[in-house]
């Protein structure tokens, strides 16, 4: 997980940027055009960003496009390297985990550069689910939306919230933590317990809701409050999507997705 602080010019507020690349998934599994995409979660109080919290899914091919655009606009400023395209690490799940780590390292370095951070294409890549042609049209003024409009429209969307809430409730019922970093509870309240049968008829008894003593938060207390729930699982088509819940290997708290050896040749180059 990427996390760093930077003092603003007036030294009054510490800028915090948290970025995570995680939850690799195989899209269109079983077809000739299957590929792996990754969840990118970003939370910040930096004024450079339109939305303070965002969550999108991007594939490796889109990272390659982003780096080319950043290099074109950055001039002599060096752009971080991406993980290799055809390097094998023994097993498929190990390869995907190495790639995930490489993509996160790439974004961490990019977001530390003031020059690269000023590129509008980077912001649309991180904070909207626009495709590559749509991003190019937006920054070139060939779209009906401005860059800020596209980011805010995506940030205000609550699509997939009900499904994410149900899944999280199911995990919590089993004593687990929510798996999606984008699930943000609307409040710290749980359902109020029902009164014991012996006291159900006592109308003078008041049952107050139970409030969690610990509210989920990110690493830094300086981060601004999250105003609206976000879920990035709706950015990709639902058809042919596999969450691959079986046998995931945890490395540093993130999860790598195992692939069958037969799938590796069609997936790794995408």
UniProtKB/Swiss-Prot annotation:
Coiled-coil region(s): none
Signal peptide feature range: none
Domain of life: Eukaryota
Single GO BP term: vesicle organization
A single GO molecular function term of this UniProt record: phosphatidylinositol phosphate binding
InterPro entries: PX_dom (IPR001683), PX_dom_sf (IPR036871), SNX10/11 (IPR043544)
Primary localization class, coarse: membrane
Annotated spans, Important for membrane trafficking: 135-139
Annotated segments matching region Disordered: 168-203
Keyword Cell membrane: yes
Biased composition (Basic and acidic residues): 168-177
Location of this chain's protein in the cell: Cell membrane; Endosome; Cytoplasm
One cellular component (GO) term of this entry: plasma membrane
CDD domains recorded: PX_SNX10 (cd06898)
PX domain mapped to chain residues: 16-132
Record keywords, A-Z: Cell membrane, Cytoplasm, Endosome, Lipid-binding, Membrane, Protein transport, Transport
Assembly behavior: Monomer. Interacts with TRPV3; this interaction promotes TRPV3 trafficking from the cell membrane to lysosome for degradation.
PANTHER family, sorted: PX DOMAIN-CONTAINING PROTEIN, SORTING NEXIN-11
This protein's name: Sorting nexin-11
């Amino acid at each position: 997980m990427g996390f760093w602080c930077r003092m603003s010019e007036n030294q009054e507020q510490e800028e915090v940027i948290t970025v995570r690349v995680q939850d690799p998934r195989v899209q269109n599994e079983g077809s000739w055009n299957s590929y792996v995409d990754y969840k990118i979660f970003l939370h910040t109080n930096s004024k450079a960003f339109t939305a303070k919290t965002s969550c999108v899914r991007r594939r490796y091919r889109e990272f390659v496009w982003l780096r080319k655009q950043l290099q074109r606009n950055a001039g002599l400023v060096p752009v971080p390297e991406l993980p290799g395209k055809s390097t094998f690490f023994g097993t498929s799940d190990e390869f995907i985990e190495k790639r995930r780590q490489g993509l996160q390292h790439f974004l961490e370095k990019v977001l530390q550069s003031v020059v690269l951070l000023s590129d509008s294409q980077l912001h649309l890549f991180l904070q909207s689910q626009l495709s590559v042609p749509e991003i190019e049209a937006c920054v070139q003024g060939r779209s009906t939306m401005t860059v800020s409009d596209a980011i805010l429209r995506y940030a205000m969307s609550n699509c997939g919230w009900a499904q994410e809430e149900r899944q999280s409730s199911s995990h919590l019922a089993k004593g687990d933590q929510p798996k999606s970093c984008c699930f943000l509870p609307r409040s710290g309240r749980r359902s109020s317990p029902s009164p014991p049968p012996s006291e159900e008829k006592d109308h003078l008894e008041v049952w107050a809701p139970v409030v969690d003593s610990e509210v989920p938060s990110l690493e830094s207390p300086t981060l601004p409050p999250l105003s609206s729930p976000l879920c990035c699982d709706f950015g990709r088509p639902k058809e042919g999507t596999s969450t691959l819940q079986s046998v995931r290997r945890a490395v540093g708290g993130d999860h790598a997705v195992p692939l069958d050896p037969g799938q590796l040749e069609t997936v790794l180059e995408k």
